Every structure is written in C-alpha cells, then in structure tokens.
C-alpha cells in the first residue's frame, strides 16, 4: 500500500498543513465514509455538515472553509483538484497486463518498446509499433499499421482497426472500438453503394476513451481527437470528426460525420450533433441538447425539455401542436387592430 505524509502532500499541492504534518495518508475517501489513514475533501458547501462528523485523518479545504475547522487539514486553492492529484498519487488500479502472455498472437513485423505488456489472447497485427510501457489487455486486437505511444493503456477487449494512431499516456476502456468504417454510402436508384473508408484515426496524448465508445475512421482523411480530450462511455464519434484539445464529452452523446468541435468544450450526456457543423472553442452543451446549426460563440447552450408530471406534459404537448394556429390567429388580430376604421 502506498503512503505519504501531509508534509509531502503540501509540497505536491502547494498547500499549507493545519495540524500534524507528519500524519501518514494511505488513501482517499468521501467525508461520509473516510476512516483513519484517509484524506477527504470539501468542494461543495452542501456537504459542510459532513465535515464536522468525518472520521478522515485529514481534509483538503479551501482557506475559507479551514478557518472554522478544528481538525487536521491541508489548505489548498482548489480542494477538488487537490483530491484528484492525491488520488493519482495513491492510485492502486491494477495494470491492464503484466509481461507478455504466451497465448498472445504477435506478428513478427511488430515493434515492441521496452516494458510492453500484452495480456492473454491479445492479437498484435503486422507493422504495429508499441511504445515503451504500453499495456495491452486480454483479448484486445490491434490491427495492422497501428502506432501506440508510450505509457498508453488499453484494457481488455478493445479493438483497434488498421491505421489507428494513439498518442502517449492514453487510456482506452474495455469494449471501445476505434477505426471501424464510417457510415459512408451513395444511393443509386434506391440501392446503397458502399464508399470504402480509406482514412484512419489520429488520437493525441493524454486522451481517455470510455467503455463501449466507437470512433469511426475517416472516409478519405482522418478522424482526429486532439490532446487531453476525455470521452465517456457509449459515445459515437463519426467519420472525419475533429475534436479539439481538452474537450470533454459525456456518455451516450452522438456526433454525426464531419463535425468540428473546438478546444475546451464540455458536451453533456445524450447530446446529438448533426453532421458538417462547427462548434467554437469554449462551448458548453447541457445534457440532451440537439445541435442542428453552427455555434460560432462560446457559452452555455441547451435545448432539452425538463421532466414534468405526465398530465402537465400532455397538456403542453397539445398546446405545442397548436402553436402555428395560435400564431396565425394573433397575426390576424394584430392586422385587424391596425386597420383604420
């Protein structure tokens, strides 16, 4: 088990210890469930009552919250960011693979960097390049001509089709499929003609892709996911999409083809973005927002209808269907009221 003193954490987080700086911390926990040897955090004032009752050995607090706290604290600028840093330091997540399992199938042309680990029944295709300390989980398939940067981790049962490049320090979760064909077809007299998807996928450094998400390859050029992007579970990224640096996309969101999303965007869960659109840097879409036009300015956008009692929803639905009729009636009334007698 890893452990660290509060003094060491204060140096890591540029914080100030309030209490015993020799106290040893071995893990993180919530205020409600923390016990001795654990550090917790207060990032939301609605949990203030739990602060007074917590059994944590120490708590990450802002300077304001630390003023009235009598227990041991590490005072930092942002307690939630501090929590994330400490959680990384004390992380006990097992590796996706250790060593090279004898059942792994590795093409002789593949190049493996120092410290590469490959799990049981994984398949490594022709001309694949794996950087140093790459971890390939059991049952994962890496198609030909793929490149994976150092320290990247693929969990069990990930599939990379051919010509997919992953940067350094990426995490790809189980069930993710990267490089499958985009939805490209031409219609000739009612019959669909498949367009070969000859592009690839290019993913930058420090990208995380959630379980069962799908990233389609480009039709001609590449689908691009830039540095620092985080993608939740069950997200669909279509052919030739471009996602800018440090953008976050929550679960069950769907991007149609040739969408360009800027840097530092936050896309809420269950959003749908139509094809061939551009979304500016710094756009925030709340959950279940449907985007059908370009977004040129940063800001918060929403379109979903909030939940309500069924009887109220039914009434509003009927009224919505009557809006055009109501508009025409109002327009007629306004016209008649402006007519001189």
UniProtKB/Swiss-Prot annotation:
Protein name according to UniProt: UDP-3-O-acylglucosamine N-acyltransferase
Q: What does this protein do?
A: Catalyzes the N-acylation of UDP-3-O-acylglucosamine using 3-hydroxyacyl-ACP as the acyl donor. Is involved in the biosynthesis of lipid A, a phosphorylated glycolipid that anchors the lipopolysaccharide to the outer membrane of the cell.
* Active site (UniProt): 239 (proton acceptor)
Show the Pfam families listed in the entry.
Hexapep, Hexapep_2, LpxD
Annotated keywords:
Acyltransferase, Lipid A biosynthesis, Lipid biosynthesis, Lipid metabolism, Repeat, Transferase
Q: Which domain of life is it from?
A: Bacteria
> What EC number(s) are associated with this protein in UniProt?
2.3.1.191
Q: Which reaction(s) are listed as its catalytic activity?
A: a UDP-3-O-[(3R)-3-hydroxyacyl]-alpha-D-glucosamine + a (3R)-hydroxyacyl-[ACP] = a UDP-2-N,3-O-bis[(3R)-3-hydroxyacyl]-alpha-D-glucosamine + holo-[ACP] + H(+)
GO function term, MF aspect, one: N-acyltransferase activity
- The answer to whether UniProt assigns keyword Signal to this entry is no
Concerning Gene3D superfamilies, the annotation shows: 1.20.5.170, Hexapeptide repeat proteins, MurE/MurF, N-terminal domain
Q: How does it assemble?
A: Homotrimer.
Concerning PROSITE patterns, the annotation shows: HEXAPEP_TRANSFERASES (PS00101)
**What GO cellular-component annotations does this UniProt entry give?**
membrane
Pathway assigned to this chain's UniProt record: Bacterial outer membrane biogenesis; LPS lipid A biosynthesis
What is the native source organism of this protein? Shewanella sp. (strain MR-4)
Q: Which GO terms describe its biological process?
A: lipid A biosynthetic process
Q: Which InterPro entries match?
A: Hexapep, LpxD, Trimer_LpxA-like_sf, UDP_GlcNAc_AcTrfase_non-rep
The UniProt entry's sequence similarity note says: Belongs to the transferase hexapeptide repeat family. LpxD subfamily.
